[in-house]
């Protein structure tokens, strides 16, 4: 039996990170977590590129643009969509998750979904580096593993 796994080293990887400016007090912490993870695993700062977008809904089109360039081993998508009193949350979170998945499949580049979709602001804060860890860090770990797995399978 042959088993394929991605190594957990970011040495030599080129990573694009897309960050939603909406809820920036949360997303900036997710970004810090992603960058921390990448650097701790050997990525050079010069190989990390960050692109800010207005909101989570704009993430998929920029993910497609970045994934299409052929220069990134992975694209990490970071945002925070917090439920409010209207159905807007459902529309945004659904379309962003579908859009990110489609880009990854279409471009055969790991496009990692690091967008928080929470019911409350407290839940978002917990997932941005307090009690529930930092989902930006977790997204970067997925990007590292998937990038290396894609290389193994090529």
From Swiss-Prot:
- What are the catalytic residues? 88 (proton donor)
Positions bound to 5-amino-6-(D-ribitylamino)uracil: 22, 56-58, 80-82, 113
Question: What is the E.C. number?
Answer: 2.5.1.78
Query: Which reactions fall under this protein's catalytic activity?
Result: (2S)-2-hydroxy-3-oxobutyl phosphate + 5-amino-6-(D-ribitylamino)uracil = 6,7-dimethyl-8-(1-D-ribityl)lumazine + phosphate + 2 H2O + H(+)
The protein's annotated pathway: Cofactor biosynthesis; riboflavin biosynthesis; riboflavin from 2-hydroxy-3-oxobutyl phosphate and 5-amino-6-(D-ribitylamino)uracil: step 1/2
Q: Could you say which residues bind (2S)-2-hydroxy-3-oxobutyl phosphate here?
A: 85-86, 127
Give GO MF terms, alphabetically. Answer: 6,7-dimethyl-8-ribityllumazine synthase activity
Q: What keywords does the record list, in alphabetical order?
A: Riboflavin biosynthesis, Transferase
The alphabetized list of GO BP terms reads: riboflavin biosynthetic process
Q: Give the GO cellular component terms, alphabetically.
A: cytoplasm; cytosol; riboflavin synthase complex
Family of the protein in this entry: Belongs to the DMRL synthase family.
Protein function: Catalyzes the formation of 6,7-dimethyl-8-ribityllumazine by condensation of 5-amino-6-(D-ribitylamino)uracil with 3,4-dihydroxy-2-butanone 4-phosphate. This is the penultimate step in the biosynthesis of riboflavin.
Please state what the protein is called: 6,7-dimethyl-8-ribityllumazine synthase
